[in-house]
Amino acid sequence: MRRFLRTGHDPARERLKRDLFQFNKTVEHGFPHQPSALGYSPSLRILAIGTRSGAVKLYGAPGVEFMGLHKENNAVLQIHFLPGQCQLVTLLDDNSLHLWSLKVKGGVSELQEEESFTLRGPPGAAPSATQVTEILPHSSGELLYLGTESGNVFVVQLPGFRTLHDRTICSDEVLQWLPEEARHRRVFEMVEALQEHPRDPNQILIGYSRGLVVIWDLQGSRALSHFLSSQQLENASWQRDGCLIVTCHSDGSHCQWPVSSDTQNPEPLRSSIPYGPFPCKAITKIFWLTTRQGLPFTIFQGGMPRASYGDRHCISVVHNGQQTAFDFTSRVIDFTVLSEADPAAAFDDPYALVVLAEEELVVIDLQTPGWPPVQLPYLASLHCSAITCSHHVSNIPLKLWERIIAAGSRQNSHFSTMEWPIDGGTSLAPPPPQRDLLLTGHEDGTVRFWDASGVCLRLLYKLSTVRVFLTDTDPSENLIAQGEDEWPPLRKVGSFDPYSDDPRLGIQKIFLCKYSGYLAVAGTAGQVLVLELNDEAAEHAVEQVEADLLQDQEGYRWKGHERLAARPGPVCFEAGFQPFVLVQCQPPAVVTSLALHSEWRLVAFGTSHGFGLFDHQQRRQVFVKCTLHPSDQLALEGPLSRVKSLKKSLRQSFRRMRRSRVSSHKRRPGGPTGEAQAQAVNIKAERTGLQNMELAPVQRKIEARSAEDSFTGFVRTLYFADTYLRDSSRHCPSLWAGTNGGTVYAFSLRVPPAERRTDEPVRAEQAKEIQLMHRAPVVGILVLDGHNVPLPEPLEVAHDLSKSPDMQGSHQLLVVSEEQFKVFTLPKVSAKLKLKLTALEGSRVRRVGVAHFGSCRAEDYGEHHLAVLTNLGDIQVVSMPLLKPQVRYSCIRREDVSGIASCVFTKYGQGFYLISPSEFERFSLSTKWLVEPRCLVDSTKAKKHNRPSNGNGTGLKMTSSGHVRNSKSQSDGDEKKPGPVMEHALLNDAWVLKEIQSTLEGDRRSYGNWHPHRVAVGCRLSNGEAE
């Protein structure tokens, strides 16, 4: 009965927990999912992006970030900053207006929603009468002019959103000021443009969709002049001196109209169709910007020839005889031009073009000849190719960091040297305490290295593995330079490229040794590459070795995709990580596990068929081990023919549900009679399974799984350790492997000493085989030394960055399966402790990592614990080696299967997971390590808005990027409410990740359902937490 007794409450331990553990969701890295609106404040130099899920994100200088979330789950249609103020107005698709303010509290700025408003019409009026289409914040900062679908312009006073009905500009009133010939045409309908006169705040421009443009005198309530076009109006804007109006139209034309009090109905000075004479698409927005040199900039969106280029997403820039149509790979949401902010200035002098596309943000330098792009310090398009895996490395040595940055800088020669132009606000966060890397593998065979040290996730270097293989579309053979005379003058910009040359190139596993510079990557078609960092470009052949994982098996036939064909002969590689050996697994199945030991120069790899060990110093295979069970036919079908096993998959799913339901009833009686009754129940449940879809929730105790379940040989984890494997007197190198069927294999390795390492071969011999009784998949293996501390990383002791492991006391083996944790003594491998995670909750371990938790009070105190993520989205911290649960937090929605599958833990109690295809959510479990924005925006100290200078380097001077603070801890189960967090989407990842995850998920959840979801937070949102 002792095991049923609750342990006593220990106040000292509870206080220590508060010093060690605290859950926070801190910052979102990447590009906002499904952007829908763009805004910019010239006085604050802050950019705003709205999304379809109702989020508003503000960005200034690197490290200056804010986020707000509307209570309503509606798309943001427009964002407008109030001139000269720290306020902005948003328009949602439910026709509601919201006023936001940046207010200083506690020395930092917070984004708060002040009030909301919906324009109401008279009783019985049609909804279009008050449907807002255009918003003009007046320069006074006290009035909003709202154009509507009915053609009326309403005036709303701020603050308070009070409608001034006596100042409404009705379409009937405007009609009275038009000449007789214009009154007979349907010149109104909706308002398409509202612009204040750049020199006279008493005049506004009103543009109607039917082609009428009116200059309205606010004081005299009269039309000063009007302009009538024969084409439908899309947009209109002033020239800086107010003497010229530029309009753009639905036929792909734009016109210039002189503004004069003498002429009431002038003809356009100039009308042109830039990409005519054939029918063109509409020009939806246009800027006409003056310069000191005298030649203006004309920048417009759309207008491409409808027949040949109607599917292109282009923004054209015309200046001084040069014309370029910037071609984006995703739909353009909106754009703006950064120019001289002082209204009294004589010229616009534009210096940057900011384009918000559906999948990325692009900034073009308009000062430098050729108009090159500007490198982004944040808002990176993480999903330029679909993310398939991720890997985090903490505390990178300075030398390796500098070498990676140097290799990356050579890839950035096409970027402008302009300093980042959106530099509003001040980051108050201290410099990050260490250098961290986040590596992401992608579907197109690339690996991207990101600076994850602080708030800004910045791309440092991109590695491509494509050159190692021959693909159907070789980029080196298909690059066709565009001639100078080609029309239209298209130029591809941006990094988003959703198309992959070959899905087999996808990266599935990454392992980087930060001490030696060795990198191992593995892919979808069984390819394993070992790479070494080289500071110079080189040309060499990549040695190829085949690892046949089925060499001892007969009668198996692989039905999946073929292997990738390696490129023969020497290959040119740029500076950076260069591959020197390729290990090709046969069959070419997805590589499911990878481990690299740079001190022993060994790399281990596993698939659904087995695992192998390769000596990359001698370029030879050490051994392969087939883990297939005779029933693992599904493992041979491969991802491209998985649909063939649908019937078998459904049958196995119902068997699992049947066992779950039966186990929740009374215990099965013993003897033949009980077995017969149980068999009858099983048969009946299987027959009626398809009809009875309303099943009880899965609540089961741990039970042994059948050895005939599919994918029992699926290798889930690989682990190197120098420990006591054969006897307690001698320790030796070893390799451990855990499979989907609950089997753990241990191989003792004989690695020759350094002086004979190149001559003598590495030898391996199987020493142990452990079969877990419940046969749950093994997701983690760890060896603890005599002091119960995890063994250090390879070369960590040699670099004096870790103490030598205690080899005097007895070592312990920790095996983490999906359903329980178990500690074994070594070398006898006798069970010592265990923790059942899934007793009655149906939860299973999805991710596990070892983290060091430092105390926020005592600098020299810390503990090593396991960070565990379950399929329910909960994160638990479990002590080692006593396996005592410490805290538990709810982190990810249980429906977000792909978000759970993408989670990665760091060595210091932080983590990342994908909340959308383009965004990582960062969270922290530690009180000591917390990266969050802390910034200040002060309107009274607005910067002088000179154009950014062009200097040497990339201009990405990261003055601050994170904040490490100590804060009040949270008790278990009462975690801090997540603040401005967008858990609004699931990962729409590559088919490879879907296939692997669907294999691992017992309940066969559907990937097709995408249910947007938001965390309910208050209106008051700070840049780190909700209040």
Swiss-Prot record:
SMART domains: WD40. The modification Phosphoserine is found at S653, S971, S1022. It holds the Pfam family WD40. It is found in: Cytoplasm. Residues 654-669 have a biased composition (Basic residues). GO terms for biological process: branching involved in labyrinthine layer morphogenesis; cell division; establishment or maintenance of polarity of embryonic epithelium; exocytosis; L-leucine transport; labyrinthine layer blood vessel development; multicellular organism growth; placenta development. Keywords: Cell cycle, Cell division, Cytoplasm, Exocytosis, Phosphoprotein, Repeat, WD repeat. Its main location: cytoplasm. Residues 957-970 have a biased composition (Polar residues). One of its GO terms (cellular component) is intracellular membrane-bounded organelle. GO terms for molecular function: PDZ domain binding. Residues 654-678, 940-981 are annotated as: Disordered. Phosphorylated at Ser-653 by PRKCI. Phosphorylation is enhanced during cell polarization induced by calcium. Phosphorylation may occur during the cell-cell contact-induced cell polarization and may contribute to the segregation of LLGL2 from the PRKCI/aPKC and PARD6B/Par-6 complex. WD repeats lie at residues 36-69, 76-117, 132-169, 193-227, 233-268, 282-324, 332-366, 388-464, 508-583, 592-653, 715-771, 780-832, 837-890, 904-927. Part of a complex with GPSM2/LGN, PRKCI/aPKC and PARD6B/Par-6, which may ensure the correct organization and orientation of bipolar spindles for normal cell division. This complex plays roles in the initial phase of the establishment of epithelial cell polarity. PANTHER family: LETHAL 2 GIANT LARVAE PROTEIN, LLGL SCRIBBLE CELL POLARITY COMPLEX COMPONENT 2. Belongs to the WD repeat L(2)GL family. Interacts with GPSM2/LGN, PRKCI/aPKC and PARD6B/Par-6. The complex is enhanced during mitosis. Interacts with DCAF1. This is LLGL scribble cell polarity complex component 2. It comes from Mus musculus (Mouse). The gene is Llgl2.
